[in-house]
């Protein structure tokens, strides 16, 4: 929407010079080199990908053709690693179908990772409707309980469009990591 584009432009223009330079490719993204020895001896590609994502100080891009395990294996590994570190994680995709795939991946993780899906029942697969924010919060009887529930949950999932129109969530929650799946 116009409002979300306007807010995005405003955020970009009010960002510090270093951030603007990064976004305009005027400087390279930075990585924590202390991960290099572990990356070098990682047992497989997906372990290496997870470690490289953890080493990223700015952003990490994973590009590959469909069906190569980017969502089912790489995203899962990243979520598990960041979750173990106590990070607040935002998972986004451009379509509700892709968001449901992320939810399916999250549901397969053991021990179970609690997550909240932002969206509507009409666009959410039945197995994941119990994770919709309105269903998670329906037992809350006060604002304090709502805030505590949102604070307690460390993984939020939804479409880019839904999150860009629900900016009030960002006043309640700060995320350490954002992963955008299928960001073509």
PLM regions with names:
Residues 96-99, 122-124, 162-164, 184:
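Conserved nucleotide-binding/hydrolysis micro-motifs of P-loop NTPases
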Residues 56-62, 86-88:
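Pre-Walker A (Motif I) flank of P-loop NTPase domains
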Residues 63, 92-94, 158, 178:
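Generic beta-strand/beta-sheet core signal
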Residues 53, 65, 93-94, 182:
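Conserved residues at beta->alpha junctions
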């Amino acid at each position: 929407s116009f409002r979300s584009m306007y807010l995005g432009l405003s955020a970009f223009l009010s960002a510090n010079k270093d951030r603007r330079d990064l976004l305009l490719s005027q400087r390279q993204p930075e990585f924590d080199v202390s991960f290099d020895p572990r990356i070098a001896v990682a047992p497989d590609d997906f372990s290496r990908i997870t470690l490289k994502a953890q080493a990223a100080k700015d952003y990490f891009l994973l590009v590959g053709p469909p069906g190569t395990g980017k969502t089912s294996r790489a995203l899962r590994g990243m979520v598990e690693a960041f979750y173990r570190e106590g990070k607040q994680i935002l998972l986004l995709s451009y379509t509700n179908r892709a968001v449901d795939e992320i939810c399916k991946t999250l549901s397969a993780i053991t021990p179970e990772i609690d997550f909240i899906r932002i969206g509507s029942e009409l666009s959410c697969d039945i197995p994941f409707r119990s994770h919709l924010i309105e269903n998670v919060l329906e037992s809350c009887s006060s604002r304090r309980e709502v805030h505590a529930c949102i604070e307690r949950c460390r993984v939020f999932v939804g479409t880019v469009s839904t999150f860009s129109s629900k900016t009030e969530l960002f006043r309640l929650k700060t995320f350490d990591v954002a992963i955008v799946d299928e960001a073509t």
